[in-house]
């Protein structure tokens, strides 16, 4: 395996804990010197090597361990002058301080001969052993588990001692608290957010925050240590704390080992108490782990199991900021007339503040009028009043439905006979072959039903916005990418979890930058991996010129082992978060031309990922490129197999091409046939036959609510073929399936699931909601670029998928939680509450000043 491939297996460098996944492969070659090596990739459940999770050889005695560490001490870089001076001051003053060096460096600061060494965390102990054995170590200072966490002090003899851990209430500084607690005097992290945007975010994300708040409160009841101490782990800039068991981001409450720094999240503790995640009898024990897959303690005396009664309850949020924000959220939503259906007692409280209520009522009215005025010149007081009445009616029905324990969505009619028999609430009763079943989302917002909109209604809702409906009224297509009022129709459909297509995006882009010749010129000599879409094989380390030249010339395409041109796609390029660095000009061009910029830009006020403070590790939201040859001649082979994403995304077609060195008629005929077989409606087929429209890719996007039905079908087909279902794998997340016309027909016949068949042409942008299963088949050669975002409407799906991914095997590419959705929700709510609180204070102060002046 090449160094590049090995490096690609290492998890993000910003995580404090890292994962290295293994890949099983076999190599097929042929004698022709021009042949290409293809590596066959399998998604089998394989043992993994987690770099941070290695536990020392249990057969080593304690004396041998100490000897190894002493030998490695000579290889530790000496303290810098600044570090030495700082520790001299600590020694002379005898003051208590937070550990400011990694454990492996602390012995350098303790020159007393014979003194007991400070216990090392598992990261630093692993580093010492790796150094002793001559292996390179990539552990930086900040990866130390006790960095900025453990309290230290020099005693009277000059020996360094551990004196406990920080108190979350007495030790955070004002700067630490400001990160977490809403403060009307501190500007929010996000960009410009007006009153209506804040109310909109609170409407869609407020209940989810309340659910997280109550879930965090469970930690206190789960804590089993007789020591009631709660430690505070300070948030370290540029570091993402993750659970050592499930790789989910540690949001607040978790449990920590005082000896080695092992950390485990709330959900894993609940699983252990309930007996879940227990190793199956047929599976061999994983080295260094107990029967629940928990890492053994790396204590110098030897590996030991971590016991719940000995772990220390730890919180990350400083002070009482979580409770402060939770109470403030309910007060703000009550004052600002935002419907809340979380069901907790705070949602029913009445706030007796007549003056504030009157002022806020005026501010809401003004902001609605301002928003509608920007949407349409026909806005009026009557229109605003109608919207207020509709909001009030929906809030009343939401409360009524919550008390009865059923779902309510606008437009649904409840009767005594149908109450409790809704297809959404009974959708899972007949599913049998599900490993990841969403039996219920208690405390969360439920799925809204699909929306079929008439053109007459949409025109009345947003007059002047050019648009049409495809898929029999289920797919909105906006035909002017930069129309200022697009958001009205977009939100009406997007909140129901349906995809949207926006055309004419290419007008805002410099398409010369996105041409294959431009990429071949700029990056032709750079090596990268390719994938043969016909069989899924990897073609490693090829100059990208071989790929880009094949875009327009069939004779220049790389041959497979049988001499046939391969159907290639470029794998993971540009890599990771390096798009802006590798392609700065194209990055700037894309950011300038993104449709719905309030959602898709990194600083968009409805992209709530923008609310994450700068000190946090930003989630990798792209952009990403998808470059592949057309496969219309192979209708059962997808360019991108069925999968779903944890965040929302917009995918823009920036280039469509057909090789001109051969007969193009079979390709064109196959394209039209694929569109027809794909289930596209008459309007779509007519559009694709227009001479000035070049279809690029055929999408099938399914509703997120139907993901489990799709799982059930695919698992059933797997069993019918005589294969066994793997417990820690998932037919959608594994991306092994492309639903051809036969499977799609069976899905509709047996489950009633119908997707959105979408043909993406040059300049079209397809918006895919979080959690929506989708697949893509390139009809012609395509270059697509995608940007992810986190919208308030789909926050529930993001949250649920985080929990879904943690149950995948550790070797799965989707296993690790890189979105940190709880942190995003927390800081979005914090910013909205801050802005609304500040707005009413400023208004009251302004009116008071005016009265005094009069």
UniProtKB/Swiss-Prot annotation:
<dbReference type="GO" id="GO:0032454">
    <property type="term" value="F:histone H3K9 demethylase activity"/>
</dbReference>
<comment type="function">
    <text>Histone demethylase that specifically demethylates 'Lys-10' of histone H3 (H3K9), thereby playing a central role in histone code. Demethylation of Lys residue generates formaldehyde and succinate. Probably involved in regulation of chromatin structure, promoting expansion of euchromatin. Negatively regulates rhino-dependent piRNA production capacity of several genomic regions; may help define the frontiers of piRNA clusters by regulating histone methylation levels. May be involved in regulation of behavior and circadian rhythms.</text>
</comment>
<protein>
    <recommendedName>
        <fullName>Lysine-specific demethylase 3</fullName>
        <ecNumber>1.14.11.65</ecNumber>
    </recommendedName>
</protein>
<dbReference type="InterPro" id="IPR045109">
    <property type="entry name" value="JHDM2-like"/>
</dbReference>
<dbReference type="GO" id="GO:0031452">
    <property type="term" value="P:negative regulation of heterochromatin formation"/>
</dbReference>
<feature type="region of interest" description="Disordered">
    <location>
        <begin position="64"/>
        <end position="88"/>
    </location>
</feature>
<dbReference type="Pfam" id="PF02373">
    <property type="entry name" value="JmjC"/>
</dbReference>
<dbReference type="GO" id="GO:0048512">
    <property type="term" value="P:circadian behavior"/>
</dbReference>
<dbReference type="GO" id="GO:0048149">
    <property type="term" value="P:behavioral response to ethanol"/>
</dbReference>
<dbReference type="InterPro" id="IPR003347">
    <property type="entry name" value="JmjC_dom"/>
</dbReference>
<dbReference type="GO" id="GO:0006357">
    <property type="term" value="P:regulation of transcription by RNA polymerase II"/>
</dbReference>
<dbReference type="GO" id="GO:0140542">
    <property type="term" value="P:regulation of piRNA transcription"/>
</dbReference>
<keyword id="KW-0539">Nucleus</keyword>
<dbReference type="GO" id="GO:0000785">
    <property type="term" value="C:chromatin"/>
</dbReference>
<keyword id="KW-0963">Cytoplasm</keyword>
<feature type="binding site">
    <location>
        <position position="774"/>
    </location>
    <ligand>
        <name>Fe cation</name>
    </ligand>
</feature>
<feature type="binding site">
    <location>
        <position position="643"/>
    </location>
    <ligand>
        <name>Fe cation</name>
    </ligand>
</feature>
<feature type="domain" description="JmjC">
    <location>
        <begin position="601"/>
        <end position="806"/>
    </location>
</feature>
<comment type="similarity">
    <text>Belongs to the JHDM2-like histone demethylase family.</text>
</comment>
<dbReference type="GO" id="GO:0005737">
    <property type="term" value="C:cytoplasm"/>
</dbReference>
<keyword id="KW-0560">Oxidoreductase</keyword>
<dbReference type="GO" id="GO:0140683">
    <property type="term" value="F:histone H3K9me/H3K9me2 demethylase activity"/>
</dbReference>
<dbReference type="GO" id="GO:0000118">
    <property type="term" value="C:histone deacetylase complex"/>
</dbReference>
<dbReference type="GO" id="GO:0005634">
    <property type="term" value="C:nucleus"/>
</dbReference>
<dbReference type="GO" id="GO:0031490">
    <property type="term" value="F:chromatin DNA binding"/>
</dbReference>
<keyword id="KW-0479">Metal-binding</keyword>
<feature type="binding site">
    <location>
        <position position="645"/>
    </location>
    <ligand>
        <name>Fe cation</name>
    </ligand>
</feature>
<keyword id="KW-0408">Iron</keyword>
<dbReference type="GO" id="GO:0003712">
    <property type="term" value="F:transcription coregulator activity"/>
</dbReference>
């Amino acid at each position: 395996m090449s160094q590049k491939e090995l490096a690609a297996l290492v998890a993000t460098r910003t995580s404090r804990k890292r994962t290295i996944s293994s890949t099983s492969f076999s190599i097929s070659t042929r004698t022709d010197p021009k042949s290409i090596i293809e590596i066959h990739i399998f998604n089998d459940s394989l043992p993994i090597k987690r770099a941070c999770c290695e536990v020392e050889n249990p057969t080593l005695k304690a004396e041998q361990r100490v000897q190894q560490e002493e030998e490695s001490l000579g290889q530790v870089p000496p303290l810098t002058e600044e570090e030495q001076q700082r520790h001299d001051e600590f020694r002379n003053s005898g003051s208590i301080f937070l550990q400011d060096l990694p454990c492996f460096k602390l012995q350098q600061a303790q020159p007393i001969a014979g003194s007991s060494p400070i216990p090392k965390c598992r990261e630093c102990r692993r580093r010492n052993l790796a150094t002793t054995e001559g292996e390179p170590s990539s552990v930086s200072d900040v990866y130390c588990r006790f960095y900025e966490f453990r309290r230290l002090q020099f005693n009277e003899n000059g020996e360094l001692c551990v004196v406990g851990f920080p108190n979350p209430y007495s030790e955070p500084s004002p700067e630490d608290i400001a990160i977490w607690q809403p403060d009307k005097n501190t500007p929010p992290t996000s960009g410009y957010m007006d009153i209506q945007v804040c109310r909109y975010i609170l409407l869609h994300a407020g209940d989810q925050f309340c659910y997280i708040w109550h879930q965090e409160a469970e930690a206190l009841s789960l804590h089993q240590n007789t020591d009631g101490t709660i430690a505070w782990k300070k948030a370290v800039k540029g570091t993402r704390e993750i659970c050592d068991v499930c790789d989910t981001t540690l949001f607040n409450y978790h449990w920590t080992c005082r000896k080695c720094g092992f950390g485990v999240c709330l959900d894993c503790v609940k699983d252990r108490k309930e007996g879940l995640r227990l190793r199956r009898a047929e599976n061999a024990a994983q080295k260094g782990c107990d029967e629940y897959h928990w890492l053994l303690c790396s204590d110098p005396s030897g590996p030991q199991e971590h016991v719940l009664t000995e772990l220390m309850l730890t919180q990350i949020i400083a002070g009482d900021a979580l409770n402060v924000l939770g109470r403030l959220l309910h007060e703000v939503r009550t004052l600002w007339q935002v419907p809340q259906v979380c069901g907790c007692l705070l949602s029913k409280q009445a706030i007796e503040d007549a003056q504030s209520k009157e002022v806020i009522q005026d501010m809401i009215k003004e902001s609605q009028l301002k928003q509608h005025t920007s949407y349409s010149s026909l806005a009026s007081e009557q229109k605003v009043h109608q919207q207020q009445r509709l909001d009030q009616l929906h809030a009343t029905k939401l409360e009524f439905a919550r008390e009865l324990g059923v779902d309510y969505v606008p437009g649904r009619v409840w009767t005594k006979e149908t109450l409790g028999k809704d297809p959404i609430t009974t959708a899972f009763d007949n599913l049998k072959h599900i490993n990841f079943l969403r039996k219920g989302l208690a405390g969360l917002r439920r799925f809204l039903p699909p929306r079929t909109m008439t053109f007459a209604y949409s025109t009345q809702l947003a007059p002047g916005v050019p648009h049409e409906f495809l898929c029999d009224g289920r797919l909105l297509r906006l035909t002017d990418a930069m129309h200022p009022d697009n958001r009205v129709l977009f939100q009406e459909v997007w909140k129901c979890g349906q995809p949207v297509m926006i055309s004419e995006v290419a007008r805002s882009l410099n398409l010369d930058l996105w041409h294959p010749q431009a990429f071949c010129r700029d990056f032709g000599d750079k090596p990268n991996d390719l994938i043969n879409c016909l069989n899924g094989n990897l073609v490693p380390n090829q100059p990208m010129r071989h790929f880009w030249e094949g875009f327009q010339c069939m004779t220049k395409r790389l041959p497979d082992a049988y001499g046939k041109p391969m159907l290639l796609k470029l794998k993971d390029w540009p890599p990771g978060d390096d798009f802006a660095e590798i392609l700065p000009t194209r990055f700037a061009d894309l950011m300038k031309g993104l449709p719905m910029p309030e959602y898709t830009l990194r600083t968009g006020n409805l992209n709530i990922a923008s609310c994450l403070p700068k000190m946090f590790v930003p989630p990798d939201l792209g952009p990403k490129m998808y470059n592949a040859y057309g496969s219309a001649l192979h209708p059962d082979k997808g360019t991108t197999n069925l999968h779903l994403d944890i965040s929302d995304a917009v995918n823009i077609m920036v280039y469509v091409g057909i090789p001109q060195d051969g007969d193009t008629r079979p390709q064109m005929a196959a394209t039209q046939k694929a569109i027809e077989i794909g289930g596209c409606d008459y309007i779509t087929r007519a559009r694709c036959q227009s001479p000035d429209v070049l279809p690029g890719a055929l999408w099938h996007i399914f509703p997120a609510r139907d993901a489990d039905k799709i799982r059930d079908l695919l698992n059933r087909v797997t069993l019918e073929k005589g294969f066994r279902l793997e417990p820690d794998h998932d037919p959608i997340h594994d991306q092994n399936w492309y639903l051809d016309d036969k499977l799609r027909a069976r899905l509709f016949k047996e489950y009633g699931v119908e997707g959105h068949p979408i043909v993406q042409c040059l300049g079209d942008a397809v918006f895919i909601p979080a959690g929506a299963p989708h697949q893509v088949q390139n009809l012609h050669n395509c270059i697509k670029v995608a940007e992810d975002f986190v919208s308030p409407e789909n926050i529930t799906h993001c949250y649920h998928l985080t929990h879904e991914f943690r149950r995948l095997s550790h070797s799965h590419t989707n296993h690790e939680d890189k979105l940190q959705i709880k942190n995003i929700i927390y800081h979005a709510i914090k910013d909205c509450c801050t802005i609304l609180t500040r707005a009413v204070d400023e208004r009251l102060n302004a009116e008071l000043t005016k009265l005094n002046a009069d």
